[in-house]
Curated annotation (Swiss-Prot):
Protein known as: DNA-directed RNA polymerase 30 kDa polypeptide
Residue ranges, compositional bias (Pro residues): 226-236
Predominant subcellular localization, coarse grouping: virion
Subunit structure: The DNA-dependent RNA polymerase (vRNAP) consists of eight subunits encoded by early viral genes and termed according to their apparent molecular masses Rpo147, Rpo132, Rpo35, Rpo30, Rpo22, Rpo19, Rpo18, and Rpo7. The same holoenzyme, with the addition of the transcription-specificity factor RAP94, is used for early gene expression.
Residues reported in the UniProt entry to bind Zn(2+): C159, C162, C187, C190
Annotated organism of origin: Vaccinia virus (strain Western Reserve)
Length: 259
């Protein structure tokens, strides 16, 4: 492993030192056993190089150290002045991780992949202390196939483009409670998406019988043998009852008076 250059922070001075693989092993041996040491270092090296995200560094033009000490430490490291377009870095007043102070000072003094490597080491040490697995690749996921086997290729909807059953249903948009959601299927092989199949009802209206014939292959309509409801009497016209007066257009001839 390459040398890791560290700048250890203190209240009055800042010293620079180089930490080799031997020094890191000696430091880690204080927290973990030798049986877990090599696996932890190998895991931290792999994950730090794979998932390294370059942090956006703030320049000196918009970051200034505060000239005052905060009365109450509320855990906020940065404060922003919107009026003057400046940001201020607050110095922490409460020391944390006293048990891992040496490793935390090493993290503060490094940058880049070396800093990420030490952060993964600190995370792994804390997990080992608590007796939990730090490597997510070794954690077995819960299988829900006994409850619902949605992504089974045997029952999946085939893709109309490549005829593959390696498809996944996705809910694109949710709507009101009385409307169906917008669902699309995505094919993992040809990277195409398509609409789910729908049941089509072939309507054949007959004027004489007013019957609707559904597609027999999809569904069957059970006959309605219940007696018809009694015919209700036709309601009286409001005009005949004199409730509404007949109106005429001004271009029409006036009605004749009853003699």
């Amino acid at each position: 492993m390459e040398n890791v250059y560290i700048s250890s922070y203190s209240s009055n001075e800042q010293t620079s030192m180089a930490v080799t693989a031997t020094d890191i092993r000696e430091l880690l041996s204080q927290y973990v056993d030798d049986a877990n040491l090599e696996d932890l270092i190998e895991w931290a090296m792999e994950k730090s190089s794979k998932y390294y995200i370059k942090n956006i560094g703030n320049t000196k033009s918009n970051i200034e150290e505060t000239k005052f000490e905060s009365k109450n430490n509320i855990g906020i490291e940065y404060s922003k002045d919107s009026r003057n377009k400046l940001s201020y870095r607050n110095k922490p007043s409460i020391a944390t991780n006293l048990e891992y102070k040496t490793l935390c000072d090493m993290i503060k003094g490094t940058s880049g992949t070396e800093k990420e490597f030490l952060r993964y080491l600190l995370f792994g040490i804390k997990c080992i202390k608590k007796g939990v697995e730090y490597n997510i690749d070794k954690i077995k996921d819960v299988s829900y196939n006994d409850y619902f086997n949605v992504l089974d290729e045997k029952y999946n909807t085939p893709c109309p483009n490549c005829k593959s059953r390696n498809t996944t249903p996705m809910m694109i948009q949710t709507r009101a409670a009385d409307e169906p959601p917008l669902v699309r299927h995505a094919c993992r092989d040809c990277k195409q998406h398509f609409k789910p199949p729908k049941f089509r009802a072939f309507r054949n209206l007959n004027v004489t019988t007013q019957s609707i014939h559904e597609n027999k292959e999809i569904t069957e309509i059970l006959p309605d043998n219940n007696p018809s409801p009694p015919e209700s009497p036709e309601p009286a016209s409001p005009i005949d009852d004199g409730l509404i007066r007949a109106t005429f257009d001004r271009n029409d001839e006036p009605p004749e008076d009853d003699e």
